[in-house]
Swiss-Prot record:
Annotated catalysed reactions: sulfate + ATP + H(+) = adenosine 5'-phosphosulfate + diphosphate
NCBIfam families in the record: PRK04149.1, sopT
GO biological process: hydrogen sulfide biosynthetic process; sulfate assimilation
Domain of life: Bacteria
PANTHER family assigned to the protein according to its UniProt record, in alphabetical order: PTHR43509, SULFATE ADENYLYLTRANSFERASE (PTHR43509:SF1)
GO MF, one example: ATP binding
CDD domains linked: ATPS (cd00517)
Keyword terms: ATP-binding, Nucleotide-binding, Nucleotidyltransferase, Transferase
Gene3D superfamilies (alphabetical): HUPs, Sulfate adenylyltransferase
This protein's name: Sulfate adenylyltransferase
EC number(s) reported in the record: 2.7.7.4
Family: Belongs to the sulfate adenylyltransferase family.
Disulfide bonds: none
């Protein structure tokens, strides 16, 4: 049996028979809140039952804990503009819509004005408007609405055969007889360095939960459908089928570095993972965070508080002298012998149709990525 969800109980706020007839007011969600609504409803964000009230918001921003004391590192908020805020009152039940359809309701317990400057500095460690998370934070509404939600309709899925709720993955892991499961978060294609880390972790646990994020990302990130095809090709050719489970993570990317690493681990705990891989600059962007800052943040919490074991890995690479993958812990050779490419450089190569070296990425994966990006470009999709 997999370990307990965060907070002890897997939250279920789904009621598809909810009677909406008397609910008149509505809030139109953006992509971030739309994904958060469903993840709260299905228990992905357990123990959270709704969008944050000011008490939880302030506590998480300042202390990385809910008001109850439970560890939680990112504020899950419902921003609205001042015009919409003026229509709302504490005690209202309000529809949550996206694209004109109702997906949930919120029972408003709090309406408050956040200190976004403080939120940026605490959560993102910067208020630089060039940071994609900070830019998004300041572009959203300046009033936050808090209260428990009910998910009345689930969104149609881009990848239905790879979409699972926490209850589904927990059941699957149990049926497979897996007692220890390591989660791996990614918004990028899986290159040889990631493969090496995953397989090293897989040597010590029963199963790998490859859980790529398919929510909103930066415009220059590889599109989710292209990435999904590349993951399938990689798993088919290079991984033991009975040791890996592929499922998508619906959330938007925050690019909050260390804090987002904690968040990613806690969510995977809810999906049934016992371990979580934390690599270099996890959930980072640009040079805003230290290479191993995310790994260090895990040390601020006790094992009991987190309830999931971080597996910390150094930057890995192919060493031409060793003739295999390694890290600074296992390879004695100089950087000149290491095949290292930045994510930006690889994206440039792929978009130009240039094959990165086989030591960096599996050729089957590269073919899928080049073809997929070319098709997107021809269709006018970035």
């Amino acid at each position: 049996m997999s370990l307990a969800p965060h907070g002890g109980t897997l939250i279920n706020r789904v009621n598809e028979q909810y009677d909406l007839t008397s609910v008149q007011k509505e809030i139109e969600l953006d992509l971030i809140s739309f994904a958060d609504l469903e993840l709260i409803g299905i228990g992905g964000y357990s123990p959270i039952e709704g969008f944050f009230t000011e008490k939880d918001y302030v506590s998480v921003v300042e202390n990385m804990r809910l008001a109850s004391g439970v560890v939680w590192s990112l504020p899950i908020t419902l921003p609205v503009d001042s015009e919409k805020a003026a229509e709302l009152a504490v005690g209202d039940t309000v529809k949550l819509t996206y694209g004109g359809e109702t997906y949930g309701v919120v029972d408003i317990e709090d309406i408050y004005t956040p200190d976004k400057q403080k939120e940026a500095v605490h959560v993102y460690k910067t208020d630089d408007a060039a940071h994609p998370g900070v830019k998004k934070l300041f572009s959203r509404g300046d009033t936050y609405v808090g209260g428990p939600i009910t998910l009345v309709k689930k969104a149609s899925k881009q990848f239905p055969e790879f979409t699972f709720e926490p209850a589904d993955t927990r059941r699957s892991f149990e049926q497979k007889g897996w007692k220890t499961i390591v989660g791996f978060q990614t918004r990028n294609p899986v290159h040889r360095a990631h493969e090496y880390i995953q397989k090293t972790a897989l040597e010590t646990v029963d199963g790998l939960f490859l859980n790529p994020l398919v929510g909103e990302t930066k415009s220059d990130d590889i599109p989710a459908d292209v990435r999904m095809e590349s993951y399938q090709v990689l798993l088919d050719h290079y991984y033991p089928k009975d040791r890996v489970f592929l499922g998508v993570f619906l959330a938007a990317m925050r690019y909050a570095g260390p804090r987002e690493a904690i968040f990613h681990a806690l969510v995977r705990k809810n999906y049934g993972c016992t371990h979580f891989i934390v690599g270099r600059d996890h959930a980072g962007v640009g040079d805003y965070y230290g290479t191993y800052e995310a790994q260090e943040l895990f040390d601020q919490f006790t094992a009991d508080e987190l309830g999931i074991t971080p597996m910390k890995f150094e930057h890995s690479f192919f060493c031409q002298k060793c003739g295999n993958m390694g890290t600074a812990k296992t390879c004695p050779h100089d950087k000149e012998d290491h095949v290292i490419l930045s994510g930006t450089k690889v994206r440039e190569m792929l978009r130009s149709g240039v094959m990165p070296p086989a030591e960096f990425s599996r050729p089957e994966v590269v073919e899928v990525l080049i073809k997929g990006l070319k098709t997107k470009e021809e269709a006018g999709v970035s």
